[in-house]
């Protein structure tokens, strides 16, 4: 009995998470942009036949960037709910969240350069 209830709760959590992911994909332009880049790098990974270690690194930074972008979007939604008008403190909160996305994006670019520059140079 207890076990079944735990499973039901986990399934409900998955449904809620799915709703959140659906919202990100359908409504958040920044998330769509990051998702597009992720798909482009997946295609590039197959094209250049990157190694397993390179795949791990690439998938890890893709998950990092998409996750941080999702957190940034949730912070922005919450901030707008709490204070719908312009507010310096809310602006600072949003800036810090966006800065976290920038850090993860820069890290992803560094990893992409490390992975792909040798493959591109081999073509030249």
PLM-predicted stretches and their roles:
Residues 1-74, 82, 86, 92-94, ...:
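Hydrophobic alpha-helical transmembrane segments
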